[in-house]
Curated annotation (Swiss-Prot):
Pathway: Amino-acid degradation; L-arginine degradation via AST pathway; L-glutamate and succinate from L-arginine: step 4/5. One of its GO terms (biological process) is arginine catabolic process to glutamate. It is an enzyme of class 1 (oxidoreductase). This is N-succinylglutamate 5-semialdehyde dehydrogenase. Catalyzes the NAD-dependent reduction of succinylglutamate semialdehyde into succinylglutamate. It catalyses: N-succinyl-L-glutamate 5-semialdehyde + NAD(+) + H2O = N-succinyl-L-glutamate + NADH + 2 H(+). The gene is astD. NAD(+) binds at residues 207-212. Gene3D superfamilies: Aldehyde Dehydrogenase, Chain A, domain 1, Aldehyde Dehydrogenase, Chain A, domain 2.
Length: 471
């Protein structure tokens, strides 16, 4: 029986990008398990040298990789190039993080001998990647996993398999054995089989809350399998007292509409002091009206491209209509710019009057606005979500920011900066439906190896001082 195929298409044109056979989960995992012991036995210095060679391979192939990212995701070429840069930069960050978080340590001990802390790799880790950053985000799991001595089975999103293949080829050209980094092509069925496979020692996931919760439930009875979930957000950006209205508007637009709103840290909700509403919204709308929406390689370069596919675009337009029918007031309508392709104009809607605002991640260029009268109300509204990934305060004074930081429930909290664009040199993750307290980026080293505490003496020496009869 012939194996099914996965086909990826350009969001911008509908043209076929890539096709390939669906992988065999059993074969891929068995190959990884056979390869893992030899990889784990390599000296750390060797593994580090090989991931550095990987960074060099990415540099050499940067133009081709960026072009493929743009074709498969629809993001502008300038943005795809920044993603490739992030892939390269992640290597040295991961090396530093491994040394900082999981290096061998001697510990104080009241006992004779030595107390030590060392780390061991888990074994074979499954990395499940998203489509919005199909190289950078899975790479942020793969590189730390390899440094720690794990083998990796990488399942890219079925919407961006070609980028996943190109990334894996860079690892292989660097000298990392093909069985140590494998790509599993497939859809949700293959992903579920991989997660549940007994030969997988851990799952490192980036994607939607819906899929992450399903993984968590599936593995609830298997506590020995490490699970790191980086999920989405219903992120607030709060605008308070500031005279710098143009800068505030720019930060709002960057937060909401970069990557066509397809970032887990994108601002979904603008919470604004009522007395500032008219002036701020006027500036935001005028700036949003100037946004160029276009294909990845257009000239002049677009600010944002299409969303990933027509189904996603349909869902976003339906969500906008739902908010309108529920009492929302349109500030800037969402428009389908091309009937048969998923190009959407950035949309802004005042939902202050909507009684039951949906607490979901609307993964696209749709910004909801809520007016409030005092700062405590702003904080309460910002926290009015099951998610907890990113939040920003624009304006206010240091005392306001201290209150904001202390009371906001999120893993990333910024002041006068966008909600997106987090540093890879810091931990990255959220709480609630945004993650399971295993932040990625700098702290990825923590879940790629487990700690082993030891007390050690070079010769056995022992005595029992009490509780024994005399000879």
């Amino acid at each position: 029986m012939a194996r099914a195929e996965i086909v990826s298409h350009e969001p911008a044109t509908g043209a076929e990008v890539w096709r390939g056979k669906v992988g065999d989960v059993e074969e891929v995992v068995a190959r990884a398990r056979r390869a893992w012991p030899a990889w784990a036995a390599q000296p750390l210095a060797t593994r580090i040298e090989l991931v550095r060679r990987f960074a060099n391979e990415v540099r050499k192939d940067a133009d081709n990789l960026a072009t493929m990212i743009s074709r498969e995701t629809g993001k502008p070429l300038w943005e795809a190039r920044t993603e490739v840069d992030s892939v390269v930069n992640k290597v040295e960050i991961s090396i530093r993080a491994y040394a900082d978080r999981t290096s061998q340590r001697k510990l104080d001990s009241a006992l004779q001998g030595t107390a030590a802390l060392r780390h061991k790799p888990h074994g074979v880790l499954a990395v499940l990647g998203p489509y919005n950053f199909p190289a950078h985000l899975p790479n942020g799991h793969i590189v730390p996993a390899l440094i720690a001595g794990n083998a990796v089975v990488f399942k890219p999103s079925e919407k961006t398999p070609a980028t996943g293949e190109m990334l894996a080829q860079c690892f292989h050209r660097a000298g990392i054995p093909a069985a140590v980094v494998q790509v599993l092509i497939g859809g949700p069925e293959e992903g579920q089989a991989l997660v549940a496979h007994d030969g997988i020692d851990g799952v490192l996931f980036t994607g939607s809350a819906h899929a992450g919760i399903a993984i968590n439930r599936k593995l609830a009875s298997n506590p020995g399998k490490i699970v790191a979930l980086e999920m989405g957000g219903n992120n607030p950006i709060v605008v308070w007292d500031t005279p710098k209205i143009e800068d505030a508007a720019t930060l709002i637009v960057q937060s909401a509409f970069t990557s066509a709103g397809q970032r887990c840290t994108a601002a979904r909700r603008l919470i604004i002091k009522a007395s500032m509403f008219d002036e701020v919204i006027d500036h935001v709308k005028r700036l949003a009206d100037r946004i160029i929406v276009g294909a990845p390689f257009d000239d002049p370069a677009p600010f944002m491209g299409p969303v990933i596919d027509n189904r996603t675009a349909d869902g976003l337009t339906e969500s906008f209509v739902y908010l309108l029918s529920s009492g929302g007031r349109p500030i800037k309508h969402m428009v389908r710019l091309q009937e048969d392709r998923p190009f959407l104009s950035p949309a802004i809607i005042d939902v202050t009057a909507v009684a039951d605002r949906p607490d979901v991640e609307l993964f696209g260029p749709l910004l909801q606005v809520v007016r409030v009268d005092d700062f405590d109300e702003a904080i309460a509204e910002a926290n009015n979500t099951r998610f907890g990934l990113s939040a920003s305060l624009i304006g206010g004074d240091p005392q306001d920011y201290n209150r904001f930081w202390a009371n906001i429930r999120a893993g990333v909290v910024n002041w006068n900066r966008p909600t997106n664009g987090a540093s890879s040199a810091a931990p990255f993750g959220g709480v609630g439906l945004s993650g399971n307290h295993r932040p990625s980026a700098y702290y990825a080293a923590d879940y790629c190896a487990y700690p082993v505490a030891s007390t050690e003496v070079d010769q056995p020496r022992a005595s029992i001082g009490v509780g024994l009869r005399s000879d």
